[in-house]
Amino acid sequence: MNDSEFHQLADQLMLYIEETLDSFTGDSDIDYETNGGVMTLTFENGSKIVINRQEPLHQVWLATKAGGYHFNYRDGHWYCSRSGEEFLAKLSEAASAQAGENVSFG
């Protein structure tokens, strides 16, 4: 994958997250802000999830209350470099824990 492909894939992922949050109908208020390729999700309890791209490594990083994760793109999805867990599944798990209700990204 070259840098251009990486940015296109990372942009698609960020846009999908934004669209999912914009259509979220749960009770929790989840705000998001994107600045310089870094997306920050802020929850009612003040906790945050940070998603950012690491261009030199062609990775997307996810920082949650439970820990940090690095994701590589393969076979149409982003997978954790340690556990093999898919990005949207891990994000759903972390967002649900931090929101106190089910938050599904796919």
UniProtKB/Swiss-Prot annotation:
<dbReference type="GO" id="GO:0005829">
    <property type="term" value="C:cytosol"/>
</dbReference>
<dbReference type="GO" id="GO:0016226">
    <property type="term" value="P:iron-sulfur cluster assembly"/>
</dbReference>
<dbReference type="InterPro" id="IPR036524">
    <property type="entry name" value="Frataxin/CyaY_sf"/>
</dbReference>
<dbReference type="InterPro" id="IPR047584">
    <property type="entry name" value="CyaY"/>
</dbReference>
<comment type="similarity">
    <text>Belongs to the frataxin family.</text>
</comment>
<dbReference type="GO" id="GO:0008198">
    <property type="term" value="F:ferrous iron binding"/>
</dbReference>
<comment type="function">
    <text>Involved in iron-sulfur (Fe-S) cluster assembly. May act as a regulator of Fe-S biogenesis.</text>
</comment>
<dbReference type="Pfam" id="PF01491">
    <property type="entry name" value="Frataxin_Cyay"/>
</dbReference>
<keyword id="KW-0479">Metal-binding</keyword>
<dbReference type="GO" id="GO:0008199">
    <property type="term" value="F:ferric iron binding"/>
</dbReference>
<dbReference type="InterPro" id="IPR002908">
    <property type="entry name" value="Frataxin/CyaY"/>
</dbReference>
<keyword id="KW-0408">Iron</keyword>
<dbReference type="InterPro" id="IPR020895">
    <property type="entry name" value="Frataxin_CS"/>
</dbReference>
<protein>
    <recommendedName>
        <fullName>Iron-sulfur cluster assembly protein CyaY</fullName>
    </recommendedName>
</protein>
